[in-house]
Amino acid sequence: MNTLSQAIKAYNSNDYQLALKLFEKSAEIYGRKIVEFQITKCKEKLSAHPSVNSAHLSVNKEEKVNVCDSPLDIATQLLLSNVKKLVLSDSEKNTLKNKWKLLTEKKSENAEVRAVALVPKDFPKDLVLAPLPDHVNDFTWYKKRKKRLGIKPEHQHVGLSIIVTTFNRPAILSITLACLVNQKTHYPFEVIVTDDGSQEDLSPIIRQYENKLDIRYVRQKDNGFQASAARNMGLRLAKYDFIGLLDCDMAPNPLWVHSYVAELLEDDDLTIIGPRKYIDTQHIDPKDFLNNASLLESLPEVKTNNSVAAKGEGTVSLDWRLEQFEKTENLRLSDSPFRFFAAGNVAFAKKWLNKSGFFDEEFNHWGGEDVEFGYRLFRYGSFFKTIDGIMAYHQEPPGKENETDREAGKNITLDIMREKVPYIYRKLLPIEDSHINRVPLVSIYIPAYNCANYIQRCVDSALNQTVVDLEVCICNDGSTDNTLEVINKLYGNNPRVRIMSKPNGGIASASNAAVSFAKGYYIGQLDSDDYLEPDAVELCLKEFLKDKTLACVYTTNRNVNPDGSLIANGYNWPEFSREKLTTAMIAHHFRMFTIRAWHLTDGFNEKIENAVDYDMFLKLSEVGKFKHLNKICYNRVLHGDNTSIKKLGIQKKNHFVVVNQSLNRQGITYYNYDEFDDLDESRKYIFNKTAEYQEEIDILKDIKIIQNKDAKIAVSIFYPNTLNGLVKKLNNIIEYNKNIFVIVLHVDKNHLTPDIKKEILAFYHKHQVNILLNNDISYYTSNRLIKTEAHLSNINKLSQLNLNCEYIIFDNHDSLFVKNDSYAYMKKYDVGMNFSALTHDWIEKINAHPPFKKLIKTYFNDNDLKSMNVKGASQGMFMTYALAHELLTIIKEVITSCQSIDSVPEYNTEDIWFQFALLILEKKTGHVFNKTSTLTYMPWERKLQWTNEQIESAKRGENIPVNKFIINSITL
């Protein structure tokens, strides 16, 4: 019998002195919060009956365990019993199980469903909501969102603090430090070597580099494996805004510092993960690395015995993560990118330590501590990415840390990690196999204010869920009645209930406090006067587990009287759409959301009194997908004092305020969502164009289309998002294409600022080149058709004007022409495209796309895909104007087919559809067109930002590999 069970037994036997002693001991084991109430009760009993010696009192051993005056809920008793923290007899346990089954057997009723239009009929056709991320770690989407919101990083001390954790291995450490000396960067950096209690004296190694590096050395006592504590020691000393972590056996390449800092300066919400290769340095002198900066990258890769961090195939070992990096587009499409966070080569902004905390020092064996730390970064909203340029080289053999150490350590820490990382590593278990995890999978939060009369029914409904991997977080918001006393009396000793109290701040303030207090990954919302059906959490949770891209799952509710009698089923809009949510609060109770999605918003708005939930769920709908379940899982108690039915005038005002704020966050400034009438209870609305929009959008009306017999070329450009760098792009086109007749720009008209309009007009007057603006295709879509659709729309615009063109170039906003006198080059050919083989991944995506697969099978055999050269980036693609019309006719048929069955491709269509259309046309006509490559190039590094020297070098044709595009981000 454990200490807590002994304490309970002693209390129930009236041996309060012994019980107090045992409860005090239990507090040291389980935490004082769990037994604080019992300790108080023991002291009260002893104070009232100081002479009682209960040791001689008889106790019925079969008597039901009673936890002081505040019995635990049934599920909690069973969970404690499963791990021997509460002793129950078999009969007691069976009795509790039967009671729990009765409590949880009720199933939520189906809600009434009717057919509805997903998009309201009065929703403006040109009002397109901002795109959602492709996945939970879509760092590309997040970067665009921050730019739209005007969020810019603030840095005080730009530089990299490099924490190098070590234990013995002086030679290997010296090589790593030598490679840090060889860094090629203008960014400042420091090196903090943190020693986890080495027996060998490492100070001579450090002194060798004192004049070569900004270096510090700190050591902690050898208390076994304490890598987390060693890293934390270094993190607390860091002086720069950015943190880089290296293990002592990870030698960084010469661009390691520069690559990390440059990436974090661009987006300090990233956590950047570096890959590794395996090399053998045991017979190389560290001085050789100091004298030869290129030595590291010239060493051959080796096969290691490290099966935990590498997979061995053939003669070398590979970083097991590389395959996942490729499959997930450098982790952009990963649902759990923190799994690849290995602290031997990573970087992040120091600000995240204030949000997610430091490394967990409970991990005192090899492995797990970095994944758990990465999970917290992910939970609080960091985005994970791997990039080129941050390779580090793992020096083999592993030295004093052998393979057995790693495997044994991982087996120990895996259990700790499962306790503390509920997302991904936790699955739903029956209550017989469950226990109370230190970090629950689900948290239900309850803001509580003056609710003493009904808080018990509310909390009990949360505890009596079919999902038991759950905690309840109650925030007492400065109640003036005895709410806090009731909560503490009923749940103060319950390990699945966490209680906090604060001065009154209103529902938004209490909600923010409670959600911040919660430990779970999935968060459920419950008002203190309401209660849940037993399967509410389970129904929602199963949807989250099926689709990791979901930010929110919600059900519907019924309205009941305080005694539980039915008033009526609540309003239920049967299917979610963002457009409908923009016009009405359709996200009904019960609602669950992910804590990560919540951290991507600014939380509940504490400046408004009503419409707080509407505002919050609009925010959540901007950062992830919603799913609605037509189940009645929530009982909404109407007692006349509900915040949602009080102060209707303020409620209505804020309803329209929060919708307009949502539109503004999405960059939609050309519509206002306005009240239709003055009735407080009415939510009738109308969308009105803003004054800014009403201004004539085309101040470029002075541009007249002028036919020039010497001008032969049309250019179609897709220009996403903002138009920064537009004139720079136009000037580049003119510089290399003297025969340009017309440029048609597919743009988002919301970014046509007065300054940009003036720049376009000035360009037109200077060069007398016709410019057409097109905005037919919505920019706020994440599908892979958009660029192809934009080019198709552009050529349709040209056709409507009956313009006489000879060639057309299809280009991107961020490519750079380097082929002088393009027309002289083009007129030798019918078409310029890039043609290369399809990878296995591309073939799989094509076969998974029915409309395009059907088209291919019409003209080609199944095996043709493996041998056909039909893939190539589309920048700088050109063809005769007549041929473009024929190809786009074929492409339009495919787009129509896609739209008819709502089948969106999972690949960039512009990279293969033009090539396939050309081959199909050749098959249909029997004519083989004269083909060549495109007009622009790109160096192997695929750099996104070039120096002026690099641009001029490219223009001269220097250092450009054949058939490689230059992707030059001239918009930056």
UniProtKB/Swiss-Prot annotation:
Effect of residue 529 to K/N: Complete loss of GlcUA transferase activity
Outcome when changing residue 529 to E: 90% loss of GlcUA transferase activity
Compartments where located: Cell membrane
Effect of residue 477 to E/K/N: Complete loss of GlcUA transferase activity
Keywords for this protein: Cell membrane, Glycosyltransferase, Membrane, Multifunctional enzyme, Repeat, Transferase
Annotated region (A2), positions in chain: 432-604
GO CC annotation, single: plasma membrane
Region (A1): 152-325
Membrane topology: Peripheral membrane protein
EC identifiers of the protein: 2.4.1.212, 2.4.1.226
Cystine crosslinks: none
Predominant place of localization: membrane
Cofactors named for this entry: Mg(2+); Co(2+)
Catalysed transformations (reactions): [hyaluronan](n) + UDP-N-acetyl-alpha-D-glucosamine = N-acetyl-beta-D-glucosaminyl-(1->4)-[hyaluronan](n) + UDP + H(+); N-acetyl-beta-D-glucosaminyl-(1->4)-[hyaluronan](n) + UDP-alpha-D-glucuronate = [hyaluronan](n+1) + UDP + H(+); 3-O-(beta-D-GalNAc-(1->4)-beta-D-GlcA-(1->3)-beta-D-Gal-(1->3)-beta-D-Gal-(1->4)-beta-D-Xyl)-L-seryl-[protein] + UDP-alpha-D-glucuronate = 3-O-(beta-D-GlcA-(1->3)-beta-D-GalNAc-(1->4)-beta-D-GlcA-(1->3)-beta-D-Gal-(1->3)-beta-D-Gal-(1->4)-beta-D-Xyl)-L-seryl-[protein] + UDP + H(+); 3-O-{[beta-D-GalNAc-(1->4)-beta-D-GlcA-(1->3)](n)-beta-D-GalNAc-(1->4)-beta-D-GlcA-(1->3)-beta-D-Gal-(1->3)-beta-D-Gal-(1->4)-beta-D-Xyl}-L-seryl-[protein] + UDP-alpha-D-glucuronate = 3-O-{beta-D-GlcA-(1->3)-[beta-D-GalNAc-(1->4)-beta-D-GlcA-(1->3)](n)-beta-D-GalNAc-(1->4)-beta-D-GlcA-(1->3)-beta-D-Gal-(1->3)-beta-D-Gal-(1->4)-beta-D-Xyl}-L-seryl-[protein] + UDP + H(+)
Enzyme's top EC category: transferase
Short name of any one Pfam family annotated for the protein: Glycos_transf_2
Molecular function terms, GO-annotated: hyaluronan synthase activity; N-acetylgalactosaminyl-proteoglycan 3-beta-glucuronosyltransferase activity
Function statement: Catalyzes the polymerization of hyaluronan, a polysaccharide composed of a repeating disaccharide of N-acetylglucosamine (GlcNAc) and glucuronic acid (GlcUA) units. Each unit has the composition in beta-(1->4)-GlcUA-beta-(1->3)-GlcNAc.
Recorded family membership: Belongs to the glycosyltransferase 2 family. CS/HAS subfamily.
Name listed for the protein in its UniProt record: Hyaluronan synthase
Recorded name of the encoding gene: hyaD
